[in-house]
Amino acid sequence: KIPCGESCVWIPCVTSIFNCKCENKVCYHD
């Protein structure tokens, strides 16, 4: 898993367009 450099505490991952998913309040890429 690679951190996408984005948090998702208050808003969803904007980087989800790059297949980033929220996990433990941080956006990760599989």
UniProtKB/Swiss-Prot annotation:
Q: InterPro entries, alphabetically?
A: Cyclotide, Cyclotide_bracelet_CS, Cyclotide_sf
| UniProt entry tagged with the keyword Disulfide bond | yes
Coiled-coil segments: none
Q: Which SUPFAM superfamilies does the entry link to?
A: Cyclotides
Tell me the residues linked by Cyclopeptide (Lys-Asp): K1-D30
After translation, the protein is modified as follows: This is a cyclic peptide.
GO terms classed as biological process: defense response; regulation of defense response to virus
Pfam families given for it?
A: Cyclotide
Which Cys pairs does UniProt list as disulfide-bonded? C4-C20, C8-C22, C13-C27
Which keywords does the record carry?
A: Antiviral protein, Disulfide bond, Knottin, Plant defense
Q: Where are the transmembrane segments?
A: none
- UniProt remark on domains: The presence of a 'disulfide through disulfide knot' structurally defines this protein as a knottin.
Explain the purpose of this protein. Probably participates in a plant defense mechanism. Inhibits the cytopathic effects of the human immunodeficiency virus.
The UniProt entry's sequence similarity note says:
Belongs to the cyclotide family. Bracelet subfamily.
What this protein is called in its record is Circulin-D
Please name the source species: Chassalia parviflora
Q: What is the lineage of its organism?
A: Eukaryota, Viridiplantae, Streptophyta, Embryophyta, Tracheophyta
